[in-house]
From Swiss-Prot:
Keyword Acetylation: no
Phosphoprotein recorded as keyword: no
Protein name: X polypeptide
Keyword terms of this UniProt record: Plasmid
Pfam families found in the cross-reference section: SLT
Family statement drawn from the similarity comment of this UniProt entry: Belongs to the IagB/IpgF/P19 family.
Gene, per the UniProt record: X
Length: 169
């Protein structure tokens, strides 16, 4: 019994370590602070690789970064299927980083773009409030991650450039 428990624990630890490296790699490749990706993943799934979250409008989100099912047709063109997103942590993290990079390209490196990762780009007051609430939650998680590493974050809710430059220090 103890051997089985040890084997299960080692598999779980291996998966977490593997995913941790992927935050760093995806952050490097998409030029996004890996800790921001970690903060989004914590907000979206509490770091659960196989998480499924119901979205009443578009269907559901999959995996660590809760990649929305509305993107599945596009992802299928690249050979990514829904099962990959709940079984391959790196695939999920890279896919989430890809969609966050799209938001940054569209709206700049702003907290509004972080909010759009979850609430979309529709320009209505309701969506704006949803983006703000989401970005505020991610910001709190992000500053907690940075604080645990002894890094102070400038107080801002508007722009990420100063924060993203922290990763280079």
């Amino acid at each position: 019994m103890k051997k089985w428990m040890l084997a299960i624990c080692l598999m779980f630890i291996n998966e977490i370590c593997h995913a941790t490296d992927c935050f760093d790699l995806a952050g490097r490749d998409y030029k996004i602070d890996p800790d921001l990706l970690r903060a989004i993943s914590w907000k979206e799934s509490r770091y659960r690789v196989n998480a499924i979250g119901i979205n009443p409008v578009t269907g559901y989100g999959s995996g660590l970064m809760q990649v929305d099912s509305q993107h599945f047709n596009e992802l299928a063109r690249y050979g990514i299927n829904p099962e990959h997103l709940t079984t391959d942590p790196c695939m999920n993290i890279y896919t989430g980083a890809y969609y966050l990079a799209i938001a940054f390209k569209k709206w700049g490196i702003t907290w509004e773009a972080v909010g759009a990762y979850n609430a979309g780009f529709r320009k209505t007051e309701r969506q704006n409030q949803r983006r703000l609430a989401y970005a505020s939650d991610v910001y709190r998680i992000y500053t907690g991650i940075k604080s645990s590493k002894g890094i102070r974050i400038p107080v801002t809710k508007k722009s990420l450039p100063e924060i993203n430059s922290v990763q280079n220090n």
